[in-house]
Amino acid sequence: MTRRGAGMAATIGRLCGAVALALAATAGKAADTPATPTPVPAEAFAELPFISNPILSPDGASIAAQALIGGKTKLVVFKADDMHHPLVFEMGDKQIIDVNWAGPNRVLLTVGLTMNFYDIDIPVSRLLAIDIPTNTVKLLDKKSRGILAGDVLYTDPAGGSLLVASQDDPFSTPSVKHIDLATGAVAIAEKARPNVWNWYADANGVVRAGIAYDNNRWTIWYRDKAGDALTAIKGKRGKDDDSGTVDSLRFLSGDNSGLIVTNARTGRFAAYHYDFKTGTIGDAIYENPDVDISSVTVDPISGVVSGINYEDDRRRIMWLDPKMHAIQAKIEKALPGAEDTIVSQSNDSNRLLIWSGGAADPGTYYLYDRKAARIAPVAQPYTKLAQVELAPVSAVHYTARDGLSLPAYLTMPLHRGDHALPLVVMPHGGPFARDDWEYDPFVQFLANRGYVVLQPEFRGSTGYGKAFVEKGYGQWGRKMQDDVDDGVDWLVKTGKVDPKRVCIMGASYGGYAALWGAIRNPEKYRCAISFAGVTDVDAILHYDRRSFSAPRYFKQWQTKIAGEDKIDLDTVSPLPQAARLTIPVLIAQGEKDVTVPPRQAHQMVTALEKRHANVESVFYKEDAHGFSKPEDMADYLKRIEAFLTRYNPS
């Protein structure tokens, strides 16, 4: 399963120069980006990242990462100071989900595959341990057959054992297991409990808490120290001060105090002091007036929360640790104008792995050695775009017809001016998700072809607080669609776009919004493009029902889609309304999609062809709810270009 990677070494050698950036200097990226003649080949935008999810070993001596070699995803491990002799581990048909270290010589690898349970194809995961000195791979916890298998709660500093939360099957809640990495022995450290999906351990390896949800109320099962029984701390229902959702917990070992991330107080996720003994939420450690915090960063040794992560127009971190705050400032001085994220660090914080990039920069990984006062490039994930000038992306706001302020991302094509340009509006998938200020190949491809691209954060998008999400409940095809249309109207009023040259495009929920926009508002759009779009909302609800572990969870999801008034979903579904379509559409889907079944697209294409509608379609046999084959994505991009050239030319 492992071999020495000569080809890999050559590739890394090309990517990893001897260039070093002194932190005292104000140098930017490793190389300036010259202007590039357009159009850039579709293949450059279809490139999958060469390297992803890199992580430093605890001693800072090695880097493990996911790499794409010869069209196959593999795990690579190489010395941080000598990247020319990597180890390469074959993955076969497994997907890499997560990479971690257990000590300096062992990599923990969570991999995913699909298994069939009761005629349902369900993604499951497995946890592997890779011993670097012997190049051996061991499957841990052979009984685990759930979606969750690699939630590592605690790793022994010496790398000898770990605590992991895992399911025995996809429908049960996880238990916590102690795994001896030398022998592979597995012991139950904490039995599974009803409705407890999240477990937490402290820096001493003690399972301190689990969070359960039932009947719109959270319960924290908590113990003060090892040997104590778990006791229940129940949250309040309704609109009480401490109702809401708990996202995360952290502890101070041997103490009843800790940190809780919850939206209980303001409807936005924020970090608060928490007394586990009394179940009392205390003063805020950090809350943002506009957006949720997304996660907390924990010191790898002490387990103390060192930073708070949040995302407004771009990803940011507020360091609570003064040392890390100073380190971040030095990094941003050396690599200005980008999102500079510390993705991994050695236990002594001397070496840090940094990702630096943004919406118009596919990014570069750097290794920062503090003692040497040096930042050196490790790899550029997208090698074909290394010298390509990409279009700028701005965070904007506009007002919906009912007065709601909506954030969005606006991309303007280079060298085209800013008046009466063609537009592609691109609502995101989810729909309970959000866009971010990161490189998006579809956005940049469209901009490279001369199109303005608007990515609206319609109501229901996450990250902007509970109230904003709930405004989207029951609004599929209604107010959520209004928000997309209102974004087009706003841009038209600015004069930036030509109202007669607008197309709508998206994937998953975004694909639904594209098809529904074409049916509902043909006067606004010249064409629509859908990848893996939902065409029958009621059918997708019934399809999703099989993956819920209890009827009440399905009912909650059903309410989010159909609303409290349970509208007739056929009235907002493209398939039942196919006869109303009058503009050209392009429909695409991966045949291995288990999120939106391909039959939704096939049925829509058949219905439109029977009515002699202007429909083009393509189905990719080896792809799922996204592209895993660059050649397929390149083909799709070329089809998009040809389709737009015919129906919405730039």
Regions found by a protein language model. Give the residues of each.
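Active-site-proximal cap/loop segments of hydrolase catalytic domains
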Residues: F458-S650
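Conserved hydrophobic/aromatic "anchor" residues
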Residues: L56, A65, W101, Y398, ...
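Flexible loop/turn segments at secondary-structure boundaries
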Residues: G267-F269, D292-S294, D313-R315, A360-G363, ...
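Cap/lid segment of the alpha/beta-hydrolase catalytic domain
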Residues: K384-K500, A507-S508, H542
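Beta-propeller folds
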Residues: A18, G28-L352, A359-D361, Y368-K371
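Gram-negative bacterial Sec-dependent N-terminal signal peptides
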Residues: M8-G28
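Structured core elements
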Residues: L259-I260, S306-G307, L352-I354, Y366-L367, ...
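An N-terminal hydrophobic leader/cap segment in hydrolases
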Residues: D361-V396
